[in-house]
């Protein structure tokens, strides 16, 4: 049994107005499922079930068993649209998982050994919190690890600096976009402190 399951119903009332009504009157989240050899499907899910599922970070990068009106299919989260102020999910895109066929998914980033550059007097800024990957379903990682043990002050860690797990490709790199992942910089000095030092 899949640890990540979600129940949904097919929706026929489409459009932005319909989606707003779903969210406001029925506490439902509109979504779309596509991919594989089936046509795209417009669905809706209980907002509280979606929120509960996403409490577990691993749900973002695991195969989810989606039960649409009694028909089960395996999917991964492709994209989430969140409310800009409240943060709750307003719309979701799911991609069907087909064995032996590559998929793209969003995977969380885990930073390790952050204490090393901090001990050298540096401060760390995380530029991204997730990475889009392409791989076979069996190779889908739970997270991508970024090791900052050797990062020096003034260093910018790029996507190309990260070793991808076996069988996993970073989508941005495949499109020639070497994203910044984190940077280590010298502590910012408050204006008052800088003036005092100058005197």
From Swiss-Prot:
InterPro entries: Rbsml_bL25/Gln-tRNA_synth_N, Ribosomal_bL25/Gln-tRNA_synth, Ribosomal_bL25_b-dom, Ribosomal_bL25_C, Ribosomal_bL25_long, Ribosomal_L25_dom, Ribosomal_uL5_bac-type. The keyword Oxidoreductase does not apply. Transmembrane segments: none annotated. Gene3D superfamilies: Ribosomal protein L25, beta domain, Ribosomal Protein L25, Chain P. Signal peptide: none annotated. Disulfide bonds: none annotated. GO terms for biological process: translation. GO terms for cellular component: cytosolic large ribosomal subunit. GO terms for molecular function: 5S rRNA binding; structural constituent of ribosome. Pfam families: Ribosomal_L25p (PF01386), Ribosomal_TL5_C (PF14693). The keyword Thylakoid does not apply. SUPFAM superfamilies: Ribosomal protein L25-like (SSF50715). Keywords: Ribonucleoprotein, Ribosomal protein, RNA-binding, rRNA-binding. Belongs to the bacterial ribosomal protein bL25 family. CTC subfamily. NCBIfam families: bL25_bact_ctc (TIGR00731), PRK05618.1-2 (NF004128), PRK05618.1-5 (NF004130), PRK05943.1 (NF004612). This is one of the proteins that binds to the 5S RNA in the ribosome where it forms part of the central protuberance. Part of the 50S ribosomal subunit; part of the 5S rRNA/L5/L18/L25 subcomplex. Contacts the 5S rRNA. Binds to the 5S rRNA independently of L5 and L18. This is Large ribosomal subunit protein bL25. The gene is rplY.
């Amino acid at each position: 049994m899949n640890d990540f399951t979600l129940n949904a119903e097919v929706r026929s009332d489409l459009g932005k107005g319909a989606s707003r009504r779903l969210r406001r009157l029925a506490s439902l989240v509109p979504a779309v499922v596509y991919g594989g050899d089936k046509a795209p499907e417009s669905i809706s899910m209980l907002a509280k079930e979606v929120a509960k599922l996403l409490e577990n970070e691993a749900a973002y990068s695991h195969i989810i068993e989606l039960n649409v009106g009694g028909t089960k299919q395996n999917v991964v989260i492709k994209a989430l649209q969140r409310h800009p102020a409240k943060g709750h999910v307003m719309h979701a895109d799911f991609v069907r998982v087909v064995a032996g066929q590559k998929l793209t998914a969003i995977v969380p980033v885990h930073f390790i050994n952050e204490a090393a550059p901090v001990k050298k007097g540096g401060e760390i800024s995380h530029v991204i919190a997730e990475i889009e990957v392409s791989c076979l379903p069996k190779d889908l990682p739970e997270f991508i690890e970024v090791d900052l043990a050797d990062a020096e002050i003034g260093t910018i860690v790029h996507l190309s600096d990260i070793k991808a797990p076996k069988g996993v490709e970073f989508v941005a790199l495949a499109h020639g976009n070497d994203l910044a992942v984190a940077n280590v910089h010298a502590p910012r000095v408050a204006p008052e402190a800088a003036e005092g030092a100058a005197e």
